[in-house]
Amino acid sequence: MSNPMKTALSLVPMVIEQTNRGERAYDIFSRLLKERIIFINGPVEDSMAMLVCAQLLFLEAENPKKEISLYINSPGGVVTSGMAIYDTMQFIRPPVSTLCMGQAASMGSLLLTAGAKGHRFTLPNARIMVHQPSGGFQGQASDIERHAQDIIKMKRRLNEIYVQHTGQDYEVIERTLDRDHFMTAEEAKQFGLVDDVIQYRAETEKEEKD
């Protein structure tokens, strides 16, 4: 069975630009990177995290003050991979705006809410889902116990991050994330995961002027 992500990447269109040195071809994502736009599309895992972190660091080196836009359509994925992206977003100097298109579930929702305050958006028909981390481990009893303790620590840390970025009390976050909790765009705004629901690009431009 073919990998749908690989199939999609093989169909990435090329953009041809005219320069004073002739024609130059870019794949569409490289061209958007020139506009300081980064995509998180699909499951969050190590190779994706490496690419996203590298792009964030490159754009910081290029201009440490100009905003970076992070577009998210992700079902979530590996916690450590997502935390690498999260930490890099907080580490770099440029503000990072986030926009959910399609869905931001699990780790995707954490990256969505981790954007710069006032610059976290979602499109009106996007879906946001939050929940506690999950995982499995096989081995001897003492090792299983240690892994269980570690995932409880990770759960606590993730809850603290949601508290920091949403403004909700810890108890509210813990209760909300206890099971898969789905939100509409408006519900995510009311919860504090995003700052606004936008339908047209002009609305984000107005936010920037304000």
Swiss-Prot record:
Subcellular location field: Cytoplasm
Documented EC number(s): 3.4.21.92
Keywords for this protein: Cytoplasm, Hydrolase, Protease, Serine protease
SUPFAM superfamilies: ClpP/crotonase
Record GO biological process: protein quality control for misfolded or incompletely synthesized proteins
Superkingdom to which the source organism belongs: Bacteria
InterPro entries cross-referenced by the UniProt entry: ClpP, ClpP/crotonase-like_dom_sf, ClpP/TepA, ClpP_His_AS, ClpP_Ser_AS
A GO term for molecular function: ATP-dependent peptidase activity
Reactions catalysed, as given in the entry: Hydrolysis of proteins to small peptides in the presence of ATP and magnesium. alpha-casein is the usual test substrate. In the absence of ATP, only oligopeptides shorter than five residues are hydrolyzed (such as succinyl-Leu-Tyr-|-NHMec, and Leu-Tyr-Leu-|-Tyr-Trp, in which cleavage of the -Tyr-|-Leu- and -Tyr-|-Trp bonds also occurs)
GO cellular component: cytoplasm; endopeptidase Clp complex
Active-site residues, as the UniProt record annotates them: S106 (nucleophile), H131
Subunit structure: Fourteen ClpP subunits assemble into 2 heptameric rings which stack back to back to give a disk-like structure with a central cavity, resembling the structure of eukaryotic proteasomes.
HAMAP family: ClpP
Family: Belongs to the peptidase S14 family.
Biological function: Cleaves peptides in various proteins in a process that requires ATP hydrolysis. Has a chymotrypsin-like activity. Plays a major role in the degradation of misfolded proteins.
Name of the protein this chain belongs to: ATP-dependent Clp protease proteolytic subunit
